[in-house]
């Protein structure tokens, strides 16, 4: 992951680099990243990262996205323990709002890896939901809805169908 500065726009971007030489099954990983970025490119919500560009060649895959200033909720919990109720309620409302937005898409998007490490706490008090690697568009009567994915201990109960 790199931090880049677009000097013309005076904006910071994060660049995620995936190299063929660092991954055993590069094509499978690359296809997963293409699905993830194509999904995120269509979405516009203040609690979601924006994809700026995708650059690929045969050996490297780059995703240019908004830089999200802040730290994961998991870091705040490790460092400071339980958080004040007012903050937790605010974060929960924001997460419910972004999940409602994802579910309102046509077809609905199912986010399947909700956990503190995937919630970025920004300095302004807002949150951003990250890591859409296991998210997918809902498909009617798809048995994959009960496939256990995500992080054990945080997985949705319907995955244990």
What positions do the PLM features span?
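Protein kinase catalytic-loop region centered on the HRD/HxD motif
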Residues: 97-109
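AlphaC helix of the protein kinase catalytic domain
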Residues: 73-83
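Conserved activation segment of eukaryotic-like protein kinases, specifically the C-terminal portion
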Residues: 145-158
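Conserved short submotifs of the Hanks-type protein kinase catalytic core
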Residues: 58-72
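AlphaC helix of the eukaryotic protein kinase fold
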Residues: 22-42
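Activation segment signature within eukaryotic-like protein kinase domains
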Residues: 91-92
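Activation-segment/catalytic-loop signature of the eukaryotic protein kinase fold
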Residues: 54
């Amino acid at each position: 992951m790199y931090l880049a500065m677009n000097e013309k726009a005076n904006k910071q971007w994060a660049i995620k680099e995936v190299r063929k030489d660092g991954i055993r099954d590069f094509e499978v990983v690359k296809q997963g990243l293409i699905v993830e970025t194509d999904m995120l490119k269509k979405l516009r919500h203040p609690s979601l990262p924006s994809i700026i560009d995708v650059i690929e060649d045969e050996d490297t895959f780059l995703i240019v996205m908004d830089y999200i200033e802040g730290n994961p909720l998991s870091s705040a919990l490790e460092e400071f323990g339980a958080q004040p109720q007012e903050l937790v309620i605010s974060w929960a409302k924001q997460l419910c709002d972004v999940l409602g937005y994802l579910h309102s898409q046509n077809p609905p998007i199912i986010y399947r890896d909700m956990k503190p490490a995937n919630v970025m706490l920004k300095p302004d008090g807002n949150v951003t939901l990250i890591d859409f690697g296991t998210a997918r568009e809902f498909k009617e009567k798809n048995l994959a809805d009960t496939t256990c994915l995500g992080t054990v201990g945080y997985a949705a109960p319907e995955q244990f169908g």
